[in-house]
């Protein structure tokens, strides 16, 4: 079977150019969202807002061995997306292990509103699955805290 001219794969240079352009467009979309959020969080940190509000959330976050300020990253990740969570986490003074722990927990439970709605629209029980994801993220956080306490990681 012979391949016609319309069915041919575009030349490699054209594919690379297209990929680079699409990559830059994606990066610029992310920067437009993440950079302002990062600046706001950094300003809130500089003026003590994060510390004050973080103290209020500290009891909950201490269950996972995390500072109270990380609660805002979890809220941003749950309500918006992971890019918002990263923008909130970036200016915080976290250890590499704490960043990993937050990443695992948020990887399990992120964008809950939108994804819960999508699940519900497919006939699944979106609310139940959303609660399950939150519970699973909490269990993962506790397990990682335990690993750190045992000296296995972190």
PLM feature spans:
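Hydrophobic alpha-helical interface/terminus motif in multipass membrane transporters
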Residues: 40, 44, 88-89, 118-119
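Alpha-helical transmembrane spans of integral membrane proteins, capturing the lipid-embedded, hydrophobic core
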Residues: 30-38, 78, 130-138, 142
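Alpha-helical transmembrane segments of polytopic integral membrane proteins
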Residues: 33, 37-40, 50, 82-85, ...
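Membrane-interfacial helix-loop connectors
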Residues: 51-110
């Amino acid at each position: 079977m012979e391949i016609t001219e319309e069915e041919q794969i575009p030349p490699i240079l054209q594919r690379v150019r297209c990929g680079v352009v699409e990559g830059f467009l994606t990066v610029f979309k992310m920067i437009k969202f993440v950079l302002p959020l990062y600046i706001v969080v950094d300003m809130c940190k500089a003026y003590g807002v994060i510390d004050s509000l973080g103290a209020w959330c500290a009891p909950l976050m201490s269950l996972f061995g995390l500072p109270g300020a990380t609660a805002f990253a979890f809220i941003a990740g749950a309500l918006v997306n992971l890019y918002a969570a990263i923008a909130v986490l970036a200016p915080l003074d976290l250890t590499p292990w704490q960043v990993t722990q937050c990443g695992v927990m948020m990887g399990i439970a992120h964008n809950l509103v939108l994804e819960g709605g999508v699940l519900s629209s497919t006939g699944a029980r979106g609310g139940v699955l959303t609660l399950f994801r939150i519970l699973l993220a909490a269990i993962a956080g506790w397990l990682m805290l335990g690993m750190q306490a045992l000296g296995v990681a972190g």
